[in-house]
Amino acid sequence: MEYEVKKGKKGFVSPIRRLVFPKAGRRAACRSSVSRRPLHSMPLYPPDYLIDPQILLCDYLEKEVKFLGHLTWVTSSLNPSSRDELLQLLDTARQLKELPLKTTAEQDSILSLSARCLLLTWRDNEELILRIPTHEIAAASYLQDDALHLLVLKTGLGVDPVPAGVDASPGGAGRDPGPPGGAPEKRRVGTAERRHTICSLDWRMGWGGGAAEARAGGGGGGSLERQRAGARASGSWERRQTFSGSWERRHGGGGGGGGAGKPGGSWERRQAGSGGGGSWERRHPGPNPLDPQDPSPDAYCNLVILAVANRDAAEESCALICQVFQIIYGDQSIECVDRAGYHYTSTPERPWLCSRSESCHTDGTYAYDADFSCCSSFNGSQDTFEACYSGTSTPSFHGSHCSGSDHSSLGLEQLQDYMVTLRSKLGPLEIQQFAMLLREYRLGLPIQDYCTGLLKLYGDRRKFLLLGMRPFIPDQDIGYFEGFLEGVGIREGGILTDSFGRIKRSMSSTSASAVRSYDGAAQRPEAQAFHRLLADITHDIEALAPDDDDDDEDEPRGSRGGSDAAEDNYL
């Protein structure tokens, strides 16, 4: 009876049980004692989740996620917008124990976003898991798998699973214990800022701006973790520049990184180490189905799998990444055009400004792709550097846009007519001034100043050219523009209309956001077609300038008189 009474007491824990099973109690106590700092964030509102670009350029935002895994050497043909492809890959990874079957508190992480990079750190000790430069991100996708809301980042092979030799697990052996006998190391002030700054330097070096400095410093990069790691250079840019890549080490005789002690990513560690194989390799001696089959590193990519709280959190993260794409790639396009000697490039679109009702989510998956290619000719540059919002599986990046063939064919005819007229009426410098005026107007110049500048540029003898700009004025300014034409003596009808009389306003439904794309309104297909038409106009106008420069050098200023004579014949 006494035994039964003792057994029935509540709250009593046997000392033997406490000695045999100490982990559960310690783990619960440890979890309860850990205090997590508030995230460095700000509220954003659906459906657009717009943020001031200066915050992403000069600061960063933090979002709480769960880090599920980092899949390396995934075929690059994987469509991030395809729900079936992603689910099949995730199921295969779970079967191979590459991804966990369920989420736990130990997977809590912080996703830190800035214009230069994405940082992934553990939530408790804030050890760095991944540093992903923006130029390494190919796409960001949202996928709902049963009760899980997954955020999938498709990146290049240059992103290392464990950067700078730090252990990827919380409390891992790779942490720096600090001075002996000292207190546990707390979060350093400015850690996230330092990491974002370092990645900004690595990002500039990756484009060829600092290779000499990196090699002079020993090839170890500038981060604190990389200095602690010593010989191993596992940063994405540093490893490619200093040592040969993992694929070259396996197929080219070891390269220059074989003496570094640790091989590269997870697949390389499994191949190089005799006893360090993963769980799947210990159970199966054959090849891993997730390992590369085609001997070409360009045919593969990496996937970072994150879990978020709900759909809104996933949409917010995708929208932020999409805005990062716009900031970085839009700035690069402007810099490339400036280096080429031009004075204009089209303002990047924001096609993610779409409400949920306007987009179909039949498969529950959508992706934001960054199809980046730095080209010398910026014909349709807003298509080159824009981020794509696709509601269904899109086999082609550009194919996801709405088709505007009817408007494009009519716009092409209008464009050709206007280009022929401008070539015969304006000199090279005047064409460049026209392009600058059009750029300023699209960036917010009032219609009054724009019309005054055009009239001053054309002069009284060529003011009829203003009539040709009528199809390219948005609805909110068309009233003032027509009144301005009547005020300077240009009326529709009569001899002045012979040049542009057949040009009608075919895009009456086009909103002002098609010309000034940085307002908060969603763009319809007609607005996007109108925006592309304006970009083609300015591109072709600038393309005329180099040819006319040669003609201007050969012909003295007396050619201006010939132009006036041509105007008389034209009229």
UniProtKB/Swiss-Prot annotation:
Task: List the source organism.
Answer: Homo sapiens (Human)
> Which parts of this chain are annotated as the region Disordered?
164-193, 212-295, 544-571
- What span is annotated as the signal peptide, if there is one? none
Its protein name is: Cerebral cavernous malformations 2 protein-like
Q: Where is the composition biased (Pro residues)?
A: 286-295
Ranges of compositional bias, category Basic and acidic residues: 184-193, 237-251
Q: Where is the composition biased (Acidic residues)?
A: 545-555
What does the similarity note say? Belongs to the CCM2 family.
InterPro entries assigned: CCM2_C (IPR032375), Malcavernin (IPR026159), PH-like_dom_sf (IPR011993)
